[in-house]
Swiss-Prot record:
It comes from Staphylococcus aureus (strain MSSA476). The modification N6-(pyridoxal phosphate)lysine is found at residue 146. This is D-alanine aminotransferase. Substrate binds at residues 32, 99, 101. The gene is dat. One of its GO terms (molecular function) is pyridoxal phosphate binding.
Length: 282
């Protein structure tokens, strides 16, 4: 029987209930992580949970869990649910309290929920590429926190769906930031460009992996801002995330990226990613 982790216990889905006064439900007052499972093993799980605890610290949420404890509960969940290829979703909120914008009193404990699901790798997207669109970035100014507040991302993603695209690449003014659920990259003249780490983007775990792969393959990797026009005129465009992995964007705003085919550097990164899965899954 499927199990859900809820506040320290492994329970059935029918028992996994939260209060209508949970601050995650009322305010989006919480954080989350999304972790890949390959061949029954957790991929880059330490990096994910280090970020999870950083996000918690940034919003003043004391979870009383170590990275090691979070990894252990994740392993148990994967084993219980017999997940081979899939994901773990975990979120923590500031707990259950009467509706009030200020933080609740100290005795209110955080609420933590985690569950698994089988989730295939996006082989078609990886092989053939996807369509993308550009859209103004209307999100808040702490995108470095993996917050439950995702309305701006949801609206951007729905804009992409409306125009038959898989991802919306966002920009503040003319500066490209990231995708609605991914980091974004422009590849030009053999160099990979992506927005530098600051409050405007999430430091994606797959982004970190891509940077390491680029170093291994001696591909220049520049963390600097670039414009929408630069993106549209790139030789290759990719987006990356836990679920998307290294996905090529072959059409942007209805126009082909370069010749509309998946490029050679993208293929190198994908090759390196396969090796990274083998070496960084536990």
């Amino acid at each position: 029987m499927e199990k859900i982790f809820l506040n320290g216990e492994f329970v059935s889905p029918s028992e996994a209930k939260v209060s209508y006064n949970d601050r995650g439900y009322v305010f989006g007052d919480g954080i989350y992580e999304y972790i890949r499972v390959y061949n029954g093993k957790l991929f880059t799980v330490t990096e994910h949970y280090e970020r999870f605890l950083r996000s918690a610290n940034e919003i003043g949420l004391d979870l009383n869990y170590s990275v090691e404890e979070l990894i252990e509960l994740s392993r148990k969940l994967v084993d219980m649910n017999q997940i081979e290829t899939g994901v773990i979703y975990i979120q923590a909120t500031r707990g259950v309290a009467e509706r009030n914008h200020s933080f609740p009193t100290p005795e209110v404990e955080p609420a933590i929920v985690a569950y698994t699901k089988s989730y295939d790798r996006p082989y078609d997207h990886l092989e053939n590429g996807v369509n993308g669109v550009t859209v103004e970035d209307i999100r808040w100014l702490r995108c470095d926190i993996k917050s439950l507040n995702l309305l701006g991302n949801v609206l951007a993603k729905e804009y992409a769906v409306k125009y038959n695209a898989v991802e919306a690449i966002q920009h503040r003014g003319e500066t490209v930031t990231e995708g609605s659920s991914s980091n974004a990259y422009a590849i030009k003249d053999g160099v990979i460009y992506t927005h530098p780490i600051n409050n405007y983007i999430l430091n994606g775990i797959t982004r970190i992996v891509i940077k390491k792969i680029a170093e291994d393959y001696n591909i220049p990797f520049k963390e600097e801002t670039f414009t929408v026009d630069f993106l549209r005129n790139a030789d290759e465009v990719i987006v990356s995330s836990t679920s998307a992995e290294v996905t090529p964007v072959i059409k942007l705003d209805g126009e082909p990226v370069n010749d509309g085919k998946v490029g050679p550097i993208t293929r190198q990164l994908q090759e390196g990613f396969e090796k990274y899965i083998e070496s960084h899954s536990i």
